[in-house]
Amino acid sequence: MSSATSNKPLDVLNFGAFTEVVQFLMELDKLKSVYRKNKLLNRERHENTAEHSWQFAVAAMAFAPYVPGVNLERAIKLALVHDIVEIDAGDVLDAGDVLVFDNAAREAIHDEEVKAANRLFNLLPSPQNTEFLALWNEYDAVETLESKYANAIDRAMPMLLNLHNQGQSWVENHIRHEQVVSKCDYIQEILPEFWLQLKQQLEQAHQKGWLL
């Protein structure tokens, strides 16, 4: 094979349905440029949503033994899919952001996320588009054990980062202790023993001034 042939870019139009899959995957690259309120533990920069989704999925694997009956494969799928909509809607809601406690703001943002889900997942060919959208809706509805588990882990992750970086996003956004407890006490339904530990650490963070 000549060097000219070996260096020729792949013509994705020859892939048929793969073309749509590749287009979707390239669209996902934008998640690496969606930055969240939490910074990395070394505080060099804010974490991006792609990093959050990866850490979230690994956390779902790590905590699974403490949640009997949870379907880990499905929980991981929910973790990886749930924030893809931030490509269009952005990230303005996490446990370090005052808007996470504003119900009116949350409703408005949710409408944008629904639009984003429909656009982004329909980049995929059928039936994958339907499957991905169903996963996103399942996470959002918080009715299955897997979606409840995923939501609990998702709420815990920003909290854990704050507890290990001097409450960075809490301090920057003037978050109150009771706000975090109220928003995250849902964790106790899925991981009650872990929530007891977190509550103790939240009280310590409050005493240190990381939470108002």
Label each region the model flagged:
Residues 1-212:
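Alpha-helical, largely C-terminal catalytic domains
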